[in-house]
From Swiss-Prot:
Database matches in PANTHER family: TRNA (GUANINE(37)-N1)-METHYLTRANSFERASE, TRNA METHYLTRANSFERASE
Listed Pfam families: TRM5-TYW2_MTfase, TYW2_N_2
Disulfide bonds: none
Family membership noted in the UniProt record: Belongs to the class I-like SAM-binding methyltransferase superfamily. TRM5/TYW2 family.
GO biological process, one term: tRNA N1-guanine methylation
GO cellular component terms, A-Z: mitochondrial matrix; nucleus
EC number, UniProt record: 2.1.1.228
UniProt-recorded name of the protein: tRNA (guanine(37)-N(1))-methyltransferase
MF GO annotations: tRNA (guanine(37)-N1)-methyltransferase activity
Organism of origin: Theileria parva (East coast fever infection agent)
Protein keywords: Cytoplasm, Methyltransferase, Mitochondrion, Nucleus, S-adenosyl-L-methionine, Transferase, tRNA processing
Described function: Specifically methylates the N1 position of guanosine-37 in various cytoplasmic and mitochondrial tRNAs. Methylation is not dependent on the nature of the nucleoside 5' of the target nucleoside. This is the first step in the biosynthesis of wybutosine (yW), a modified base adjacent to the anticodon of tRNAs and required for accurate decoding.
Annotated HAMAP family: TRM5
Reaction catalysis annotation: guanosine(37) in tRNA + S-adenosyl-L-methionine = N(1)-methylguanosine(37) in tRNA + S-adenosyl-L-homocysteine + H(+)
Length: 470
């Protein structure tokens, strides 16, 4: 019955969920971040992840905090000259023709009834400047676009206003939109396309080489036009070392890299059987997946090689009061599989405890590998060779087959190939040395115009878990 109502009124449920954040599935978590490391720490408000499938919900991807700016709201603005310095940007001025409308105070209800203010004050394409003198019965409005007003409203202004005329209006830098400001500094033939992501008060850019000369102008615009942004940084290199850190530079604002971000769960897919499950997070970072899953009652074993990331994960777990459900490890992933998962017989239904944390006998084990650059290649460690022989070692070769828990693998990866399914299949075969009987590949998001992120999901075959040759 509940499923019937959900399917029938799915769109309505989404709208209600978006409008009432903390009524529906409110979740507040806190995430911290290291300055030197850029393992970004947040005071987290978790965005919608489907923890049935452990990946971002495609239907809700538009809610993620990513800003893509274009010139769609300022198509009529063409700058006469490009700005190249911060001083020029700060002192920018131009003159534009605007429409001045003057009415008497007693006419305000009439104009309001005919949607004058809905078509001006509330319309970003037709902004309004309002001049009011409390000692006078006169009200003056400067309209940006007379031609955008509905014809009946234009007729009303013509007939009922004291005056409507064209005036020259001074426009300053603080008056223009973000898109117009970008048009002043970006000079190319592909339009204004400046993207950035936000984490709390931090805006994170990936400025391409061709725009490096104007990166500080871009940062200045972002920090001026988005009042919640206090710090703008640029990633100067790819994530490159074993700790997955990156080289960043401060472009504008405060040198404060500790971000606080509260994320509300707006809409999510959740199975109540999830409370019986165990999440094994191989590359947990500062703990976003681990904390979210534990908030839903899931037991979690979370590992990260980076000691700073593991430290912040422990701190976030304490802040979010889920320490009874999350165990943190700071180990190499291969050692984690052998010394924690295998030696503790985590895949054995008879194992009901790990380091003081209770495990459910009936629960499945979800292995999440969110390190897209190398996760596929790391899958090969599910089957390892004995160091002194060619014998294969499986994670569950020390467990009776009838007592084995199911292991569901969620492996994230990148691909730049148009035939990504074929390319991923080849990489899977090369990594684990056999064909998987069944798996799914789901598109997660676009990383760049030529690179996409995918999630590979499959139930790990018993032959792999027991270390059997194909």
């Amino acid at each position: 019955m509940l499923n019937f109502f959900y399917v029938k009124y799915k769109s309505l449920f989404k709208i209600i969920a978006i409008l009432t954040f903390n009524i529906l599935c409110y979740c507040r978590t806190v995430h911290s971040i290291s300055k030197n490391d850029y393992t970004i720490s947040n005071n987290l408000k978790l965005y919608p992840y489907s923890f049935v499938n452990f990946r971002p919900s495609p239907e809700m991807s538009q809610i993620l905090k990513k800003k893509k700016l274009d010139s769609s709201s300022s198509e009529d603005f063409i700058p006469t000259k490009r700005i190249t310095t911060l001083e020029e940007l700060k002192n920018y001025e131009r003159l534009e023709e605007r429409t001045k409308v003057t009415i008497t105070k007693d006419k305000i209800p009439l104009f309001a009834k005919n949607d004058m203010f809905r078509n001006t004050v509330r319309n970003p394409l037709n902004s309004i400047d309002y001049y009011k003198n409390d000692e006078s019965d006169i009200r003056t409005y400067i309209l940006k676009r007379w031609d955008l007003l509905p014809s009946p409203l234009r007729d009303l202004i013509t007939n009922e206003s004291i005056d409507h005329s064209t005036v020259t209006h001074k426009i300053k830098y603080e008056d223009i939109t973000t898109e117009e400001a970008f048009k002043l500094v970006v000079n190319d033939d592909i339009g204004v396309m400046v993207g950035f992501e936000t984490v709390g008060h931090i805006a994170h850019l990936n400025v391409p080489e061709e725009r490096s000369s104007i990166k500080k102008l871009i940062a200045k615009i972002i920090i001026d036009k988005h009042k919640h942004i206090k710090t703008v940084i640029n990633k100067r290199s790819e994530v490159q070392n074993q700790f997955r850190t990156m080289d960043i530079e401060l472009l504008a604002g405060e040198e404060n890299y500790i971000a606080n971000l509260v994320i509300f769960v707006i809409l999510m897919s959740f199975s109540f059987q999830m409370k019986q499950s165990l999440l094994v997070d191989m590359f947990a970072g500062a703990g976003p997946f681990a904390i979210y899953a534990s908030k839903k009652g899931c037991s979690v074993l979370a590992n990260d090689l980076n000691p700073i990331g593991a430290t912040y994960m422990k701190r976030n777990i304490e802040i979010n009061k889920v320490h009874d459900l999350v165990k943190v490890f700071n180990m190499d992933g291969r050692e984690f599989l052998i010394d924690v998962i295998k030696k503790n017989k985590i895949l054995d239904k008879k194992t009901l405890e790990c380091d003081g944390m209770a495990l459910k006998a009936s629960g499945k084990v979800h292995l999440i590998m969110n390190l897209p650059k190398i996760a596929i290649e790391f899958l090969g460690n599910l089957v390892m060779k004995h160091r002194f022989s060619d014998t294969l070692i499986g994670l569950a070769d020390n467990i009776e087959e009838e007592n084995m828990r199911k292991l569901l693998v969620h492996c994230y990866c990148f691909s730049a190939s148009e035939e990504y399914e074929k390319e991923i299949e080849q990489r899977l075969y090369k990594s684990i040395g056999r064909k998987l009987p069944e798996y799914t590949i789901t598109h997660v998001r676009g990383v760049s115009p030529k690179k996409q992120m995918y999630c590979i999901e499959f139930e790990c075959p018993i032959s792999i878990l027991r270390g059997n040759k194909e």
